[in-house]
UniProtKB/Swiss-Prot annotation:
Domain of life per record: Archaea
Protein name: Exosome complex component Rrp41
EC top class named in words: hydrolase
GO molecular-function terms, A-Z: 3'-5'-RNA exonuclease activity; RNA binding
Functional note: Catalytic component of the exosome, which is a complex involved in RNA degradation. Has 3'->5' exoribonuclease activity. Can also synthesize heteromeric RNA-tails.
Amino acid sequence: MIQLQKPRLILDNGLRLDGRKPDEMRPIKIELGVLKNADGSAIFEMGNTKVIAAVYGPKEMHPRHLALPDRAVLRVRYHMTPFSTDERKNPAPSRREIELSKVIREALESTILVELFPRTVIDVFMEVLQADAGTRLVSLMAASMALADAGIPMRDLIAGVAVGKADGVLVLDLNEPEDMWGEADMPVAMMPSLKQVALLQLNGNMTPQEFRQALEMAQKGIETIYNLEKEAIRSKYAELKEE
């Protein structure tokens, strides 16, 4: 059996393998209204990670006995396309995809005003087109933008980024090698204007001091992403006004 050797993640010059500084994020691109048949849609790119999200609803729930009398039902599906990774993925839903669908649904339920739409259903679909770490957060943000594109009332947009530990150094917005070989990975998503956490998970080990520093790093990154999200919405509506 071939033993894979852990690569150095932080080089002698203090930079990461992809040339970024420890507190530097990958380039971000957001586009709304990319699917004409969905009520709302968005593509969210963070480096080489690329996710498309589509929203349908609120619409009448079928069968009706599954409807809730006081709120909308939120159905969420996170799926990685077979061509999203280096090795072709089995198209059947994996345990990880089912788990992440639940994690993302719970985060979205904290921001959508589901109580405004009793006896209805809102469907959210996310397809990972390219995966290079951070797919849960990019999918969550793509879904948040697609919901905004659909005009569904929310308490706030969701912005998120992961902070990890690579060769003992805290790094912002992990790439695939850092995700695979690093000592810790902490995805954080927030509703920034409300200063509320929508998602926080920690895999690996951090000291209490590192955890506090990681949270501060994440908050700075989230503020940058949040501004880009708002700008993407403004751009979309500026285009609609011109039409």
